[in-house]
UniProtKB/Swiss-Prot annotation:
GO terms for cellular component: aryl hydrocarbon receptor complex; cytoplasm; nuclear aryl hydrocarbon receptor complex; nucleus; RNA polymerase II transcription regulator complex; transcription regulator complex. Residues 549-566 have a biased composition (Basic and acidic residues). One of its GO terms (molecular function) is RNA polymerase II cis-regulatory region sequence-specific DNA binding. It comes from Rattus norvegicus (Rat). Keywords: Acetylation, Activator, DNA-binding, Isopeptide bond, Nucleus, Phosphoprotein, Repeat, Transcription, Transcription regulation, Ubl conjugation. Residues 112-264 are annotated as: Required for heterodimer formation with EPAS1. GO terms for biological process: cell differentiation; cellular response to oxidative stress; circadian rhythm; embryonic placenta development; G1 to G0 transition; intracellular receptor signaling pathway; negative regulation of inflammatory response; nitric oxide metabolic process. Monomer. Homodimer only upon binding to a DNA. Efficient DNA binding requires dimerization with another bHLH protein. Interacts with TACC3. Interacts with HIF1A, EPAS1, NPAS1 and NPAS3; forms a heterodimer that binds core DNA sequence 5'-TACGTG-3' within the hypoxia response element (HRE) of target gene promoters. Forms a heterodimer with AHRR, as well as with other bHLH proteins. Interacts with NOCA7. Interacts with TACC3. Residues 167-171 are annotated as: Mediates the transcription activity and dimerization of the AHR:ARNT complex. This is Aryl hydrocarbon receptor nuclear translocator. The keyword Ribonucleoprotein does not apply. The gene is Arnt. It is found in: Nucleus.
Length: 800
C-alpha cells in the first residue's frame, strides 16, 4: 500500500500489475520500492514487444537483464585496465627518453669540461652551469675581444713582423723559441738568444731543448712538453695563482688548443762574443741570476736560470704544410710549445757579485735651521766613514773646509728663499780618515703647509770622485757668484797647497816691489821726476778668473768690491788690511770696455807726464764721473777761486766749508761694516800708486798692494811752484767731502786711493764723486772763507 502510494504513476500506467503488487504477492526479484521502480522502468520497453504471457516474460526479462549488467561490468573493468597499462607504459617510455637525454647532455658537458682547461684544472667537478660559463670564457679568450682580425694577425698596421718581434723581445729581455712537444726539437729561435745566453742561433737550430737545459731539469722539461697520459704525474702547481690543482693527468687539457705553460729551468750559457751595447744590462742580470748556482768551475758549462712562459699550439699551423724532407712530415697534426725565455732575477743576490756595483756614493741627511744633523742615512759609513751617531747633533759646517764654510752657509740661506726648490753646492767635506772629499750637496727645505715655516733641510750628499778633473757645478741663479769676486772663486777652486804656494810667491813679489818703489821714490826730488814714472814699478799680478761670468765689464757705478761684499773674502785672506779692502772703481773705463783681459799682464810702458794733472805729488784719485750738470757746477765754482795762489791750500777743520746737506751720506758711511774698512783712510797702508786708466783692479792677494808706511815723508808739499802750471786746478779742492775732515795732510796718509762711496738712498746712476775733482788733493795750506764761493747755493743737495 505504501508502494502504491509512493508510486501512483506506476499503478496507473500498469493496471494489471497494480492489484497483485498491492495484495502482497511480490515477485522474487522485488526487494524494495526503489528496485521495483527501476525494474518496472526497464521492463516497459520489453513489455511493448513481448507477445507471450505476462508471467513467463517477467522471469525471462529478469535473467537477461542481470547477465547484461555483468557483461557491462566486466567490459568496463577491462577497458580501465588497458588504459592504465597504456599510461604506465607511456610514463616508462618518457622516463627512458628523459634518462637517455640527460645522459647524453651529461656526456657532452663532461666532454666540454675536459676540453676547457680552467674546468679540468679544478679540484672539484664543477656543475653544469659553471662548465658552460667557463667554456664561454675560454672561447672568448681564444677568439679575442673582437677588435683584432680573425686571421690571427694581432699586430698594428704600422708595424712589420720584424719590428713587432724586436719590440716584444726588447721589452721582455728574452728570446722566442718554438720546440716540438713530441721530440723536443727546436723549430725556431730568435736572434736575441745571443745577448741573453751568449749563444748563436746556429747552436740551437738542429738541436733539442733537452740539450740546452741542465741535466737535472730534463725530466721536468719533458713533463711540461708531454701531451699524453702519464701515471707518474703528481700534483700540478699553478704558478700564477699558487694553488695546488687536482692530482692526475689531464690529457684533454694538455692536448687542447691554447694550454698555457710556465716553468723555470737552467739553460746553458755560451761564450760567444756579444755586442757590448746589448750586454750592458743583460750581463749584469746574468751575474745576478748565478746566485744560488754556485761558483763557475773551470771546464764546466755555465748555466743560468731562465723563466719560460708560453702556450701549446698545433703544429703545423692551419694552412701551413711541412716540406717533404722535414722529419716530422707525415706524422699528422702535432703540438708545439711557443714560449719566451727570460732571465730570472733571483730574490737573494750574492754580496760578492754586487760589491762593485752597489758601492754607495751618497747618503741622505736632514738638518734643522741651524744646520745640525737630525737624521743621517746608514750609507754615510761607506761614503764618508762616519757612523750615523757620530754625525747626529753636530753642525755640518764643522765638517766643511774653512774656506768653504761661508759658501755652505750662503747656500742654506738661498735654499730658504727658494721655498722647496733644489739647490746644489759643492764643498770639501772632512772624512773620518781626515781626508778632504769633494761633496756635492743637493738640498731643499720642507715647510709646514699650515704655518708656511721652514722646518728642516733635506740634503742628498754625493761623493764626487776625481773632483780635480771635473768642473765645478754651476750654482743656480740665486747665488750671484759675480758679486763674490774672482778672488773667492779662485780660492775655492784651488787646493790648499796650491793656494799657500801662491801666497808665498806673492809675498816675495811684494817685498821686491816695495824695495823698488822705496828706492825710486827717494830719488824723486820734485814734480819733474814723474815724467819718467814707469808702470813697471806697480805691475799688477794677473788674475785668472774662475768662470766666464767674471769677464763681463763693470758698469760705471759698479765697484769690484761693493759694500755688501761677501765676508768670506777676509776669512780667506786675513793679511789684507782694512784699507786694502776698500771698494775700487775706475772713472776712465767706459761701460762697454773690459776692465782687464783674463790672464793678461800689463806691459811696462812709461807713462806720459801729462797724465799727472794734480798740483801735488800725490797721484790723482780716480773717481767715478757724474752727470754733466754736476761738472758744470764745479767748473763755475773753480772760476770764482783765487787764480794767484801758487800751491794747493791746506784746510783746517775750522775754516773748511762744510756741506750740511751731505751729512746723511756721512752717517750712512759710518754705519758700514768695519770688516771691509770703508771710509777708513787714516792708515798709511794703501794700494800702490796706479793712475793708468783701466789699471786699478783687485788682486787675489796682498802682493799687488804693498804696505808703505814711510811714503808720507817722501812727499813734502810743493809750495813754491808757480801758478802758471796749474792755474785752473788750484781752487778745485773746495769741494772736498765732509768725510775727510780731520785729515789735513791728506796726501801724506794715502796715495792713489780709488774710492767709491755708494749711498743706499742714491741710485747707482748718480755717483757721489765727480770727474772734475781728479786733482783737488794738492797742498792744502791756504784757508778759504764762504765769501769766495757766491755760487755755492747751486750745489745740488744730497739729503735724500
Amino acid at each position: 500500500m505504501a508502494a502504491t502510494t509512493a508510486n501512483p504513476e506506476m499503478t496507473s500506467d500498469v493496471p494489471s500489475l497494480g492489484p497483485t503488487i498491492a495484495s502482497g504477492n511480490p515477485g522474487p526479484g522485488i526487494q524494495g520500492g526503489g528496485a521495483v521502480v527501476q525494474r518496472a522502468i526497464k521492463r516497459r520497453s520489453g513489455l511493448d514487444f513481448d507477445d507471450e504471457g505476462e508471467v513467463n516474460s517477467k522471469f525471462l526479462r529478469c535473467d537477461d537483464e542481470q547477465m547484461c549488467n555483468d557483461k557491462e561490468r566486466f567490459a568496463r573493468s577491462d577497458d580501465e585496465q588497458s588504459s592504465a597499462d597504456k599510461e604506465r607504459l607511456a610514463r616508462e617510455n618518457h622516463s627512458e627518453i628523459e634518462r637517455r637525454r640527460r645522459n647524453k647532455m651529461t656526456a657532452y658537458i663532461t666532454e666540454l669540461s675536459d676540453m676547457v682547461p680552467t674546468c679540468s684544472a679544478l679540484a672539484r667537478k664543477p656543475d653544469k652551469l659553471t662548465i658552460l660559463r667557463m667554456a664561454v670564457s675560454h672561447m672568448k679568450s681564444l677568439r679575442g675581444t673582437g677588435n683584432t682580425s680573425t686571421d690571427g694577425s694581432y699586430k698594428p698596421s704600422f708595424l712589420t713582423d720584424q719590428e713587432l718581434k724586436h719590440l716584444i723581445l726588447e721589452a721582455a729581455d728574452g728570446f722566442l723559441f718554438i720546440v716540438s712537444c713530441e721530440t723536443g726539437r727546436v723549430v725556431y729561435v730568435s736572434d736575441s738568444v745571443t745577448p741573453v745566453l751568449n749563444q748563436p742561433q746556429s747552436e740551437w737550430f738542429g738541436s733539442t731543448l733537452y740539450d740546452q737545459v741542465h741535466p737535472d731539469d730534463v725530466d721536468k722539461l719533458r713533463e711540461q712538453l708531454s701531451t699524453s697520459e702519464n701515471a707518474l704525474t703528481g700534483r700540478i702547481l699553478d704558478l700564477k695563482t699558487g694553488t695546488v690543482k687536482k692530482e692526475g693527468q689531464q690529457s684533454s687539457m694538455r692536448m687542447c688548443m691554447g694550454s698555457r705553460r710556465s716553468f723555470i729551468c737552467r739553460m746553458r750559457c755560451g761564450t760567444s762574443s756579444v755586442d757590448p751595447v746589448s750586454m750592458n744590462r743583460l750581463s749584469f742580470l746574468r751575474n745576478r741570476c748565478r746566485n744560488g748556482l754556485g761558483s763557475v768551475k773551470e771546464g764546466e758549462p755555465h748555466f743560468v736560470v731562465v723563466h719560460c712562459t708560453g702556450y701549446i699550439k698545433a703544429w703545423p699551423p692551419a694552412g701551413v704544410s711541412l716540406p717533404d724532407d722535414d722529419p716530422e712530415a707525415g706524422q699528422g697534426s702535432k703540438f708545439c710549445l711557443v714560449a719566451i725565455g727570460r732571465l730570472q732575477v733571483t730574490s737573494s743576490p750574492n754580496c760578492t757579485d754586487m760589491s762593485n756595483i752597489c758601492q754607495p756614493t751618497e747618503f741622505i741627511s736632514r738638518h734643522n735651521i741651524e744646520g745640525i744633523f737630525t737624521f743621517v742615512d746608514h750609507r754615510c759609513v761607506a761614503t764618508v766613514g762616519y757612523q750615523p751617531q757620530e754625525l747626529l747633533g753636530k753642525n755640518i759646517v764643522e765638517f766643511c773646509h774653512p774656506e768653504d764654510q761661508q759658501l755652505l752657509r750662503d747656500s742654506f740661506q738661498q735654499v730658504v728663499k727658494l721655498k722647496g726648490q733644489v739647490l746644489s753646492v759643492m764643498f770639501r767635506f772632512r772624512a773620518k780618515n781626515r781626508e778632504w772629499l769633494w761633496m756635492r750637496t743637493s738640498s731643499f727645505t720642507f715647510q709646514n703647509p699650515y704655518s708656511d715655516e721652514m722646518s728642516i733641510f733635506i740634503c742628498t750628499n754625493t761623493n764626487v770622485k776625481n773632483s780635480s778633473q771635473e768642473p765645478r757645478p754651476t750654482l743656480s741663479n740665486t747665488i750671484q757668484r759675480s758679486q763674490l769676486g774672482p778672488t773667492t772663486n779662485l780660492s775655492l777652486e784651488m787646493g790648499t797647497g796650491v793656494l799657500a804656494s801662491r801666497q808665498q810667491q806673492q809675498q816675495q813679489q811684494q817685498q821686491q816691489q816695495q824695495q823698488q818703489q822705496q828706492t825710486e821714490l827717494d830719488m824723486v826730488p820734485g814734480r819733474d821726476g814723474l815724467a819718467s814714472y814707469s808702470h813697471s814699478q806697480v805691475s799688477v799680478q794677473p788674475v785668472a778668473t774662475a768662470g766666464s761670468e767674471h769677464s763681463k765689464p763693470l758698469e760705471k757705478s759698479e765697484g769690484l768690491f761693493v759694500q755688501d761684499r761677501d765676508p768670506r773674502f777676509s776669512e780667506i785672506y786675513p793679511n789684507i788690511s782694512a784699507d786694502q779692502s776698500k771698494g775700487l772703481s775706475s772713472s776712465t773705463v767706459p761701460a762697454t770696455q773690459q776692465l782687464f783681459s783674463q790672464g793678461s799682464s800689463f806691459p811696462p810702458n812709461p807713462r806720459p807726464a801729462e797724465n799727472f794733472r794734480n798740483s801735488g805729488l800725490t797721484p790723482p784719485v780716480t773717481i767715478v764721473q757724474p752727470s754733466s750738470s754736476a761738472g758744470q757746477i764745479l767748473a763755475q765754482i773753480s772760476r770764482h777761486s783765487n787764480l794767484t795762489q801758487g800751491s794747493a791750500p791746506t784746510w783746517t777743520s775750522s775754516t773748511r766749508p762744510g756741506f750740511s746737506a751731505q751729512l746723511p751720506t756721512q752717517a750712512t758711511a759710518k754705519t758700514r761694516s768695519s770688516q771691509f774698512g770703508v771710509n777708513n783712510f787714516q792708515t798709511s797702508s794703501s794700494f800702490s800708486a796706479m793712475s793708468l786708466p783701466g789699471a786699478p783692479t783687485a788682486s787675489p792677494s796682498t802682493a799687488a798692494y804693498p804696505t808703505l808706511p814711510n811714503r808720507g815723508s817722501n812727499f813734502p808739499p810743493e809750495t813754491g811752484q808757480t801758478t802758471g802750471q796749474f792755474q785752473t786746478r788750484t781752487a778745485e779742492g773746495v769741494g772736498v767731502w765732509p768725510q775727510w775732515q780731520g785729515q789735513q795732510p791728506h796726501h801724506r796718509s794715502s796715495s792713489n786711493e780709488q774710492h767709491v762711496q755708494p749711498t743706499s738712498a742714491q741710485p747707482s746712476s748718480q755717483p757721489e764723486v765727480f770727474q772734475e775733482m781728479l786733482s783737488m788733493l794738492g797742498d792744502q795750506s791756504n784757508t778759504y772763507n764762504n765769501e769766495e764761493f757766491p755760487d755755492l747755493t747751486m750745489f745740488p743737495p744730497f739729503s735724500e
